[in-house]
């Protein structure tokens, strides 16, 4: 702040009215006079002073100086006066490579990517100059892989590929285009990697969800790089640990942070708070927060409040929230979201809505994330009133077209028992989204309410709309078929899942089919489904055994009980259930033999289970 004030004072004294102009002229301005002043204007975003300086450049005849004219182009680009910058470029008597670089970089920074690429192409054709900075600048604005590869070829032909600035830009470009493997190959090729190169590669890995490689790259840097990791490196590495829930490596990084004296850097400290919170070490997160002291900002406060909430320390979170004002800070949308979402996830609906009302009282507009969290908290008839209130806020916020909010609304009404309301919302939304989650909440909701035909209807509509069903979709519709005993439809969907969509049934799907076939008395078919599994779990045998008890099938019951006993040798339930089958069939000798087996194995009978059925 002090530096900026000095710059403003300097520029103001030199370029505003009367004496200032005399000062410039009396000191015989030269080609080194104007560029630093123009740079100061750019940093301050001071368009007015920049224009005054522009006039002085022209008046004193220094517009012909490439260095000064380039500084004008750069200044206008920095203060977002693109038209003025391009006009200066056009009027320049002679363009240099630096002028083209300033214009290309400025166009990219201001979002004029096509114009930047066009200017880059024109510069190549006209031969007005191109260097590694030009190529790196254009790579920085490239967002498609085809164009990026063409630029890569150009860099190779021009001999720029191995320059660290260009190599780093290529790593970033490939990462940005989702080609992290190509980014890794380019990273390996860069001969003299800078800390910026390592940071670009680590950031790219994180953007592409390959967090598991970040610790290895960080270790490579420490082992082979002549440069030390900086705050950006530490933030990225710590953030990766948070995503991986790698507490051990996170603690090692914390130790290194302290050794390098980065622990009081706001970004690094905030990343540590987030890492410890996600790794369920809330006490460590709190200690890091307290050690930040004067360097912590609202983001740090939001991180620790969120961390306390996700670790169930809601009282501490509220205490921290109440201290914000004493630190001269005001809660923002993220602060409120942390508390409201946290209380919602903890099932504390009253507290969640209490903070929601407080948020509204300070005229804070609820975010879509906040509304979604509150809707998820409304899960029964007792919270229906609250759910309807949030529906009103959804309408007020014109958020009825947001797929996540809409899905949460449907789910809320289904959970609260108003399937007809959920259906009205579903039917009104056109065109229907391709996200299967939107359809799944309808199918599972109908299934749980016993409206199985409606669940199947939605599934068929999903197929008509060419939506790709997920594994969860099949779980929901098979469960619905099981509840209504529709064996034919369930079997058809089970085959469809494998033959048409290529899914391998999970334990949940197998369980649904066993339950469906078992309820209908088709126990042999249920057993055949289990036999198709490579490693049947205890849950599928438990489901089959339950069906055997319902239909009094001692043969399959014995087989299921023995398999279940092998998988869970300490569990007495299979013997107790088998005993109840024998008792129902009045096979008392078998009941007694089961009792002896339980005694011999010293199994503790679970409460609620009877040996006599």
From Swiss-Prot:
* Gene3D superfamilies given in the database record: Tetratricopeptide repeat domain
Q: Repeat as a keyword?
A: yes
Keyword Membrane annotated: no
Name the UniProt key words of this record, in alphabetical order: Repeat
- Extract the PROSITE patterns matched here: PPR
Tell me which domain of life the UniProt entry assigns to the organism this sequence originates from.
Answer: Eukaryota
Q: Where is the segment annotated Type E motif?
A: 540-613
**MF terms in GO:** RNA binding
Name the InterPro entries on file: E_motif, Pentatricopeptide_rpt, PPR_At4g14850-like_plant, TPR-like_helical_dom_sf
- Where are the annotated PPR repeats, by residue? 30-64, 65-99, 101-126, 128-162, 163-193, 194-228, 230-264, 265-295, 297-331, 332-366, 367-401, 402-432, 435-469, 470-500, 506-539
Please give the family membership noted in the entry. Answer: Belongs to the PPR family. PCMP-E subfamily.
**Protein's recorded name:** Pentatricopeptide repeat-containing protein At2g02750
Q: Whose protein is this, by species?
A: Arabidopsis thaliana (Mouse-ear cress)
């Amino acid at each position: 702040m002090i530096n900026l004030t000095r710059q403003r004072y300097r520029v103001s004294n030199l370029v505003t009215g009367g004496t200032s102009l005399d000062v410039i002229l009396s000191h015989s301005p030269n080609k080194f006079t104007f560029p630093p002043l123009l740079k100061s204007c750019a940093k301050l975003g001071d368009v007015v002073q920049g224009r005054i300086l522009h006039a002085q450049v022209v008046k004193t005849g220094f517009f012909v100086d490439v260095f000064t004219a380039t500084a004008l182009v750069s200044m206008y680009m920095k203060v977002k006066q693109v038209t003025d910058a391009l006009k200066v470029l056009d009027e320049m008597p002679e363009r240099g490579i630096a002028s083209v670089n300033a214009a290309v970089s400025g166009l990219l920074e201001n979002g004029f990517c096509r114009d930047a690429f066009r200017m880059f192409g024109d510069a190549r054709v006209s031969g007005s100059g191109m260097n590694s900075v030009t190529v790196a600048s254009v790579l920085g604005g490239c967002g498609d892989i085809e164009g990026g590869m063409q630029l890569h070829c150009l860099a190779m032909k021009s001999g720029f590929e191995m320059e660290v600035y260009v190599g780093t830009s290529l790593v970033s470009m490939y990462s940005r285009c989702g080609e992290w493997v190509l980014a890794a190959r380019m990273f390996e090729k860069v001969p003299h990697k800078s800390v910026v190169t390592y940071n670009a590669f680590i950031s790219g890995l994180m953007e592409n969800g390959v967090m598991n490689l970040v610790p290895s790259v960080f270790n490579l840097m420490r082992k082979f790089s002549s440069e030390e990791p900086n705050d950006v490196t530490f933030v990225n590495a710590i953030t990766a640990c948070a995503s991986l829930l790698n507490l051990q490596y996170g603690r090692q990084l914390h130790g290194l942070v302290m050794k390098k004296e980065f622990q009081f850097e706001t970004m690094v400290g905030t990343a540590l708070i987030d890492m410890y919170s996600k790794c369920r070490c809330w006490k460590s997160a709190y200690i890091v927060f307290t050690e930040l002291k004067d360097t912590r900002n609202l983001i740090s406060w939001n991180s620790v409040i969120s961390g306390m909430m996700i670790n169930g320390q809601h009282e501490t979170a509220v205490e921290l929230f109440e201290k914000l004002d004493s630190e001269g800070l005001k809660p923002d949308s993220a602060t409120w979201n942390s508390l409201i979402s946290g209380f919602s996830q903890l099932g504390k609906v009253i507290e969640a809505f209490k903070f929601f009302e407080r948020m509204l009282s300070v005229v804070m507009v609820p975010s879509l994330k906040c509304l979604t969290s509150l809707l998820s908290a409304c899960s029964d008839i007792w919270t229906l009133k609250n759910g309807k209130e949030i529906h009103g806020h959804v309408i007020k916020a014109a958020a009825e077209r947001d797929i996540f909010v809409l899905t949460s609304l449907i789910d809320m009404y289904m959970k609260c028992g108003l399937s007809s309301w959920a259906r009205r919302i579903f039917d009104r939304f056109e065109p229907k989204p391709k996200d299967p989650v939107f359809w799944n909440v309808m199918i599972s909701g109908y299934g749980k309410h016993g409206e199985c035909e409606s669940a199947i209807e939605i599934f068929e509509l999903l197929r008509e709309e060419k939506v790709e069903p997920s594994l969860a979709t099949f779980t929901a519709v098979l469960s619905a078929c099981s509840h209504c005993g529709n064996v034919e439809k369930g079997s058809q969907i089970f085959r469809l899942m494998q033959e048409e969509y290529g899914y391998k049934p999970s334990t949940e799907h197998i369980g649904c089919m066993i339950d469906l076939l078992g309820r209908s008395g088709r126990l042999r078919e249920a057993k055949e489904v289990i036999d198709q599994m490579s490693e049947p779990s205890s849950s599928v045998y438990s489901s089959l055994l339950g069906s055997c008890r319902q239909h009094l099938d001692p043969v399959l019951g014995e087989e299921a009980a023995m398999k279940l006993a092998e998988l869970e040798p300490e569990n007495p339930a299979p013997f107790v259930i088998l005993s109840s089958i024998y008792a129902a069939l009045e096979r008392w000798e078998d009941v007694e033999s089961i009792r002896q087996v339980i005694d011999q194995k010293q199994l503790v009978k679970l409460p609620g289970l009877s040996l006599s059925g």
